[in-house]
Swiss-Prot record:
Native species: Octopus vulgaris
Transmembrane segments: none
Family listed: Belongs to the DAMOX/DASOX family.
Other facts noted in the record for this chain: The enzyme is inactive in complex with 6-hydroxy-flavin adenine dinucleotide (6-OH-FAD); the complex is not physiologically relevant but an artifact of purification procedures.
Localization, UniProt: Peroxisome matrix
Free-text function comment from the UniProt entry: Selectively catalyzes the oxidative deamination of acidic amino acids. Suppresses the level of D-aspartate in the brain, an amino acid that can act as an agonist for glutamate receptors. Protects the organism from the toxicity of D-amino acids. May also function in the intestine.
Cofactor: FAD
Chain's gene name: DDO
Protein name: D-aspartate oxidase
Subunit organization: Monomer.
UniProtKB keywords: FAD, Flavoprotein, Oxidoreductase, Peroxisome
Origin organism lineage: Eukaryota, Metazoa, Spiralia, Lophotrochozoa, Mollusca
Gene3D superfamilies assigned to the protein according to its UniProt record, in alphabetical order: D-Amino Acid Oxidase, subunit A, domain 2, NAD(P)-binding Rossmann-like Domain
Group of enzyme by EC: oxidoreductase
Amino acid sequence: MVKIAVIGAGVVGLSTALQVKQNFPFCSVTVVAEKFNTETTSDGAGGLFRPNFLTLSANPLESIKQWSQDTFSHFNNLFNSPEASDCGIALMSGFLLSNKEKLDMIEDISLGQSKMTAEQIAKMGFDCKHVTKVLTYTMECRRYMPWLTSKFLSLGGSMHHHRLKSLEELVGVYDVVVNCSGLGAKDLVPDPLVYPVKGQLIQVEAPWVKHFYFFEDDTYVIPNINRTSLGGIRIKNDYSTEVDPEISKSIWQRCTSRIPSLQKAKVLWEWAGLRPHRDPIRIEQDVMNFPKGTLKVVHNYGHGANGVSLSWGTAKHATRLVRQFLENDPELRSKL
């Protein structure tokens, strides 16, 4: 039997593990990770499907479009299925607001968008020049990640709690490894192009907020099913995972000044974490040589703040690369 390991249990790792198991049901597929569920960076995702093309500029546009479209199609299928209530997806309309930069999404990866006129912007009380109304999805990761895990395990996948110090540990144990280690890839590969971007948000109870708001200065308000996320920040090469009270104060001030109805919202909890960024995102095959032997690796990491928006699409891409490894190696092909 072919043995495949997926390193990492964030939204990218779990999406990849599920697709690999779905495509290769007779292979043994194991998720190997140090952190699971609420311990992962994905737990702090705002969850809005909105690929940020400004932070993805190092990637080929056609790749970004394909990853985005594949993820959007997956979310669309989930929303129109009985799984919707369990997986955390919601259909959401909202506003992209800016003075300088265009924050529009590509039209064919949203359910619709339209520019607001200056008169409409004034009536809404928005203090900006450009506003685009968008219909898209939000995904609540505290529901989605357990759902992905459950689906993966139901197909016969397995989980292994382990902190890897080197990929060499997997030589001779697994036939193919999919590396979705996020920021861990900086030391595990090692890859000097990976760096942390600190994010911080406040989760509040505000059931009266029914639309998302995304501003060009990384300020956002994103309602999910049971809570609303207020953010945010983007600090490169900051390794602190502690909630900074001054940053929280800034987030609260920015969000409540623009959406005054949030001023009496109940704070549920605060979160800070490190988003794993790389220019470009790394999705490719790699045959790594170690003293113990060689290891077939498919890399899939470096998504930064685009983990949720690109997760299913990059997982699909990585799964194709796994298939190439299996089909092009006579020994592995004979085990299928």
